[in-house]
């Protein structure tokens, strides 16, 4: 299921957001998408869009990441992902983001066995080896963070 968050902005504000550098937020959790979108809005940071891919039965975070890379005003790609269905596409998108001068920042909650079990029950995702995943995405140029606040802080610093 695809979920968009109501960012409580007018048509004028949406046009203003598109006219300046902004943040795209992609999440596999609808609740996290809403929390982060609200946090970024509270910091007066413009969002190009915030989308939740849910259990990814029809579309994946990689699909929206590839779309976000094509948006000229999107300068920061912030992700909350429990797993990646297409890791090679993710890594290719990360390299493309670097080429375009866009920062990709990732919060991945699968560090502990409890987090991996939670991901499996939440979205049906199978989280792989955390250390291997982290090494690969960092080598591809992705900024990795450990906490939700860091995700918002890094996105804000990169945008300003």
Predicted features and spans:
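Catalytic-core regions of core metabolic enzymes
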Residues: 1-160
